[in-house]
Amino acid sequence: MRIGVIGAGQLGGTLATWCAESGHDVAVTSRHPERLREQVDRMNGKLRVMSVPQAAAFGEVVIFAPNWSGAKEAVDVTRSALEGKVVIDVTNPADGAPVAAGPGGAATGSHLTGASIKDPILVAAAINGPPSEAADRMLSHAGGKSGLETLIEWAPGAHWVKAFNTIPTDVLSRRRGHDPLLAEFVCTDERDAREAACRIIRDLGFAPFYAGGAKAARLTETGGPLQSREVDVRDATDALAEALAALR
């Protein structure tokens, strides 16, 4: 698979290297390509450095990994290239950055403060179903929107999916490929995006776990109850249910 990686920070650069090690053809963007020379040389042609528009055009799947402050600019210069493609969003809105307010209440960053979501009857009813469906039902009543939903508004022609945004790179490196596999929460409303993200997650040595649609990404982003949680895949169902219950 050809994978374009937009952003060669700690996470983006690491994912680019792992994808190349897993046999994918990878193009990564960087403002300082000389810093990637060692990784490029080591990958024997599987990893190359391109401009942001070039990497977006190169990838059959694109990993979107800029800093949140540069996310809008990155979308603006790649929107046409992303049309119809699966884009894996690994960003987190900056803590305290306004995302949007909805009728249920205000939201700051990924913090969920809508009053209706704290209704214990709603919480109890929601967690009785499959956790991923429960997340979608509960969060449809809350105010605000996830960073993923914001990206969807900016580039609606892309097939967006959230993954790789809950755990820091050092933990990913420590847990990669080791049993019990680390769960990687996946949030999307697009079937092809879910399938592509799950394939890459497995290729990189983790276990995909579907947490719900784009609204459910709020659970995994900055301030959400799944952010910074190191969860084994065998415990992922319970962790998602606990995350929903924590919103009371």
Which residues does each predicted region cover?
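Active-site-lining helix/loop region of Rossmann-like oxidoreductase modules
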Residues: 170-171, 179-248
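General beta-strand structural signal in soluble alpha/beta enzymes
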Residues: 89, 159-165, 209-211
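Short beta-strand and adjoining strand-loop segment in the mid-core
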Residues: 102-105, 109-114, 125, 129-144, ...
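Rossmann-like NAD(P)-binding element
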Residues: 40-100, 124, 128-131, 154
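NAD(P)+-binding Rossmann beta1-loop-alpha1 motif at the extreme N-terminus of oxidoreductases
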Residues: 1-45
